């Protein structure tokens, strides 16, 4: 870390200004009744950039060039084109467009003005790459804030996964983490390109109030950290200062006494525009369709950016989230089969206190552009999450009376800590006829988990002088609540912990994109070296491990035409795994390999995109919960996943934005310590996943600003949470949602109704010890939101 800081300080002292290879700005209307209003759907091009950028609904754009960008041309239907000169790396540009009276048609102006940006042409700077999405030898899908708003989602757990092929959730709790699965494995989570994933559950799901976009990376990503499942990862890009004044407020209300207020403020703090800020805040409270459940949340997220020089910028951000909720998890269980209980059934009791969570995270970033070809980025981040609470649990069927659940309270006190550092350089140079785009850097990460976990505190003495658990019976056929369950707090806090785990890793990597034949063919070799150490102490059993691993990568991408490319990818990864076996054996990392080919196409100047990928993934060193004691782990064997991903997203015709995706996945166990599981489906297996979302803005001659939405989620061939030799029948999943919206230059209103058909839906099913477990999903419910931008 000392070397990273020293390098960053050195960069701050380097000489004259440099031109920009990345230009950011906002496009606004300059005259008329909507003067100053942002213009979404404007195209921004440059002779120095191979791709065209499109402004989002707030008018913002980002354009990346292979050389320094000196000229921009902005076009928008119904407005006079504007060409501007770019000099130096100053604050974000503001470009004004004037309506073209000779060509403007009322309908065309309004329809284009209210364009929703469902697609994007470039990855965020957090992914470290400077190659347009179309030219990358990897399948990356982005979910924009317009999509999230139209679907009424308030955080990562509420349907964001429906917008990317094959992504499903383990829904054991919407408060503990996103738990996203894809291509036969749980995908890693990143925030602004930084690994802040705790050892245990988490991270806490990011709130929509701070999300700028969510990027799903299919397959391993050596350019990020290669520490994660070979299925891929997702990266949450948080809102940053834009340099232009921005003030917005959003109010939502809905079913189950749902209320939410959010504010988004930003702009310059100094006349020069060098010091900028962004402040997001949110407060929410809601009850639930499940008895005795509730959720209260508070979020504050300030960001400061300082343009130290024309070439050097510093950004500091902080996130604070406080949660209080009724149920640790809405899981229910019965011996009578999946979905056999009422939707509002719970095993909890009102006498139990709430679960409380306090989550702190921060990040500091320094970027420095040496010249038009070379840029250095350094970043440090931390996360501290504290959670405490009690809950009731049932571990096995009651043989005396299966319909009576024997509930016993458990107590958890968890603290997860992550510290992450990274530094990387992007550079461009040529060797003869070859053009190189180099990415090289270093990552360091320290994770720690302390817990008094699964504490069985409610016991009674036995005649033999021992203790036994105290049970609170609950008849699933005629539940009667009101038991007084005693609360509990660890008397010495984490000093009385039964779990302490650490993972530390350090990594060096280099990736070189070599362009041939006037950038038609791109070959991307890379390699990453990772050293990882783990230490574990679980209920008195200690273990440790140390591994040094080199993971190579090779990508190929060929541009058949300016809007069509094909690619191939070979990449390997590893996952450091914490935990202890009951015998204290060392746990080795999970290792994975991905082989993939695909084709990508941009349509209508990038207004909508399509991607098709075929993959084959192998994994070894898979970790599972010890069936004899949930505090311990076992390494079980190997599996593979193969399948097809299809993604279509964007504005296919004027006014109609779509998100359509399909995934076929075939994932099986190849070897296991339990021979009966060989050939069985992997955990949370789903054979077919198909999602569709349509949003249509009516032509202005009918009703100005009115739009309608309709979408569904469909899953067929679903497996269970744990691998089993004989699957229990799990019903298919189909949910239909619809909505209506209206917007003007400053006001947006959206009404969304989920589960229109009021289907009885279940998620994350499994069978163990004679009981069927699952998480019920809400019936028909609605949300109304209103957002005003000043």
Please name every model-derived segment:
Residues 309, 416, 435-437, 443-447, ...:
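Structural signature of Gram-negative outer-membrane beta-barrels, strongest in the C-terminal barrel
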Residues 635-723, 785-789:
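Gram-negative outer-membrane beta-barrel transporters
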Residues 62-64, 168-170, 179, 194-218, ...:
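Short acidic/polar hinge/loop motifs at secondary-structure boundaries
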Residues 28-35, 40-47, 71, 75-79, ...:
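Short, acidic, small-residue-rich periplasmic hinge/interaction motif at the N-terminus
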Residues 210-212, 223-302, 308-312, 608:
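Outer-membrane beta-barrel translocator/receptor signature
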Residues 658, 713-721, 742-790:
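C-terminal beta-signal and adjacent terminal beta-strands/loops
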Residues 368-381, 385-391, 591-651, 657-670:
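Membrane-embedded beta-barrel scaffold of Gram-negative outer-membrane proteins
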Residues 284, 288, 301-369, 373-375, ...:
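Acidic/polar loop-and-plug regions of large Gram-negative outer-membrane beta-barrel proteins
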């Amino acid at each position: 870390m000392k070397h990273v800081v020293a390098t960053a300080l050195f960069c701050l002292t380097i000489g004259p200004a440099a031109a920009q290879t990345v230009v950011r700005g906002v496009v606004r209307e300059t005259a008329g009744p909507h003067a100053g209003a942002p213009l979404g759907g404007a195209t921004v091009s440059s002779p120095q950039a191979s791709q065209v950028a499109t402004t989002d609904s707030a008018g913002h754009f980002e354009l990346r060039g292979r050389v320094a960008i000196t000229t921009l041309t902005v076009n928008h239907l119904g407005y006079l084109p504007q060409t501007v000169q770019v000099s130096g790396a100053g604050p974000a540009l503001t470009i004004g467009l004037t309506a073209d009276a000779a060509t403007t048609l009322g309908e065309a102006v309004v329809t284009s003005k209210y364009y929703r940006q469902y697609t994007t042409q470039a990855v965020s700077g957090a992914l470290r790459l400077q190659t347009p999405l179309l030219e990358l030898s990897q399948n990356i899908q982005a979910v924009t804030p317009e999509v999230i708003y139209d679907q009424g989602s308030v955080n990562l757990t509420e349907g964001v996964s429906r917008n990317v092929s094959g992504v499903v959730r383990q829904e054991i709790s919407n408060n503990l983490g996103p738990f996203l699965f894809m291509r036969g494995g749980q995908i890693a989570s990143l925030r602004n390109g930084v690994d802040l994933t705790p050892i245990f559950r988490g991270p806490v799901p990011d709130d929509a109030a701070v999300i700028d976009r969510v990027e799903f990376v299919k397959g391993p990503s050596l350019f990020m950290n290669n520490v994660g499942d070979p299925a891929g990862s997702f990266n949450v890009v948080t809102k940053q200062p834009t340099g232009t004044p921005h003030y917005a407020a959003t109010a939502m209300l809905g079913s189950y006494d749902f209320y939410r207020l959010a504010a988004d403020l930003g702009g310059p703090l100094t006349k020069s525009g060098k010091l900028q800020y962004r402040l997001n805040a949110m407060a929410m409270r809601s009850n639930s369709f499940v008895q005795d459940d509730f959720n209260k949340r508070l979020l504050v997220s300030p960001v400061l950016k300082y343009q130290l020089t024309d070439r050097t910028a510093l950004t500091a951000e902080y996130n604070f989230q406080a949660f209080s909720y009724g149920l640790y998890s809405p899981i229910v269980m019965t011996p009578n089969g999946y979905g056999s209980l009422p939707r509002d059934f719970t095993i909890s009791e009102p006498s139990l206190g709430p679960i409380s969570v306090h989550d702190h995270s921060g990040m500091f970033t320094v970027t420095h552009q040496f010249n038009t070809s070379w840029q250095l980025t350094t970043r440090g981040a931390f996360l501290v999450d504290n959670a405490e609470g009690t809950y009731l649990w049932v571990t096995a069927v009651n043989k005396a009376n299966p319909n009576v659940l024997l509930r016993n309270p458990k107590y958890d006190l968890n603290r997860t800590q992550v510290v992450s550092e990274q530094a990387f350089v992007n550079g461009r140079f040529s060797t003869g006829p070859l053009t190189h785009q180099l990415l090289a850097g270093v990552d360091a990460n320290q994770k720690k988990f302390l817990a008094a976990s699964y504490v069985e505190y409610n016991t009674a003495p036995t005649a033999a002088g021992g203790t036994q658990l105290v049970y609170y019976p609950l008849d699933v056929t005629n539940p009667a609540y009101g038991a007084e369950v005693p609360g509990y707090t660890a008397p010495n806090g984490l000093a009385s912990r039964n779990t302490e785990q650490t993972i530390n890793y350090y990594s060096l990597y280099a990736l070189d994109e070599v362009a041939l034949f006037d950038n038609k063919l791109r070959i991307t070799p890379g390699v990453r070296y990772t050293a990882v150490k783990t230490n574990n102490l679980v209920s008195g059993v200690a273990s440790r491990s140390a591994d040094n691993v080199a993971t190579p990568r090779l990508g190929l991408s060929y541009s058949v035409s300016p809007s069509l490319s094909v690619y191939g990818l070979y990449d390997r990864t590893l996952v450091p795994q914490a935990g202890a076996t009951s015998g204290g054996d060392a746990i080795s990392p999970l290792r994975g390999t991905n082989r993939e080919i695909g084709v990508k196409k941009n349509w209508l100047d990038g207004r909508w995109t399509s991607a098709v990928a075929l993959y084959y993934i192998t994994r070894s060193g898979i970790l599972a919960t010890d069936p004899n004691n949930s505090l311990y782990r076992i390494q079980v064997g190997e599996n593979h996943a193969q399948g097809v991903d299809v993604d279509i997203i964007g504005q296919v015709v004027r006014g109609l934005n779509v998100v359509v995706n399909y995934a076929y996945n075939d994932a099986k166990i190849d070897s296991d310590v339990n021979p009966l599981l060989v050939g069985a489906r992997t955990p949370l297996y789903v054979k077919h996943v198909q999602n569709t979302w349509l949003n249509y803005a009516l032509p202005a001659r009918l009703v100005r600003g009115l739009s309608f939405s309709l979408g569904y989620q469909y899953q067929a061939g679903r497996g269970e949470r744990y691998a089993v030799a004989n699957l229990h029948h799990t019903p298919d999943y189909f949910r239909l949602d619809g909505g209506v919206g209206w917007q003007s230059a400053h006001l947006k209103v959206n009404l969304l109704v989920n589960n229109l058909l009021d289907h009885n839906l279940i998620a994350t099913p499994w069978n163990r010890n004679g009981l069927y477990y699952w998480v019920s999903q809400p019936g028909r419910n609605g949300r109304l939101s209103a957002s005003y931008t000043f």
